[in-house]
Regions:
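Residue-level signal for beta-strand positions within conserved beta-sheet cores that form or flank
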Residues: 34, 71, 136
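Charged, glycine-enriched surface loops/patches
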Residues: 128-142
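Short alpha-helix boundary/capping motifs
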Residues: 25, 94-97, 140-141
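Acidic/histidine-rich, surface-exposed loop or edge segments in extracytoplasmic proteins
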Residues: 40-42, 114, 136
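Second-shell loop/turn segments in exported
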Residues: 46, 52, 117-119, 142
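A short, structured surface patch at a secondary-structure boundary
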Residues: 57-113, 119-121, 125
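Bacterial Sec-exported substrate-binding components of ABC uptake systems
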Residues: 2-7, 12-13, 22-64
């Protein structure tokens, strides 16, 4: 199980790094299309309108990766169990008070929509919620 979590963590890290690194490059050519396409763990191609500024992370593993990437200030919503996790208390106290959007087993789509995110990150086990996010034009990666 630990090996599986480590593999998933590394995969999510790769996705997130590719998403954020693309926005960090220097480009002297004016681009009319800042679209970024990422492939999530389900093999879906997800198109983003540039680097996300408002992110919801409903799973502590993806949240910890965002913290390690130094982009926790872009988080607008996190998992419901944040107050019980030592990680937040030690390295990102400011996240504890963000709106709770769900757990690794369920997610509140209405709460997510109210936060007007540029990107929602969910665990793969919540893939049945993807069509609901797509109906609302909210990019989601799993």
């Amino acid at each position: 199980m630990k090996k599986f979590k480590k593999i998933i963590s590394l995969f999510i890290l790769g996705i997130l790094m590719s998403t954020f690194v693309v926005g960090c490059g220097s480009n002297n050519v004016e681009s009319k299309d800042n679209k970024v396409t990422v492939v999530d763990q389900l093999g879906r191609e997800v198109e983003l309108d540039g680097t996300p500024e408002k992110i919801i992370s409903s799973y502590y593993i993806s949240t910890s990766l965002l913290i390690n990437l130094g982009v926790q200030d872009k988080l607008v919503g996190i998992e419901a169990k944040a107050k019980t996790r030592e990680m937040y208390k030690k390295v990102a106290k400011e996240l504890i008070d963000l709106p709770a959007v769900g757990t690794s087993k369920e997610i509140n789509i209405e709460e997510c929509a109210n936060l007007n995110p540029d990107l929602v990150i969910i665990p793969t086990r919540l893939k049945e919620f993807i069509p609901k996010f797509e109906e609302l034009n909210i990019p989601v990666i799993a």
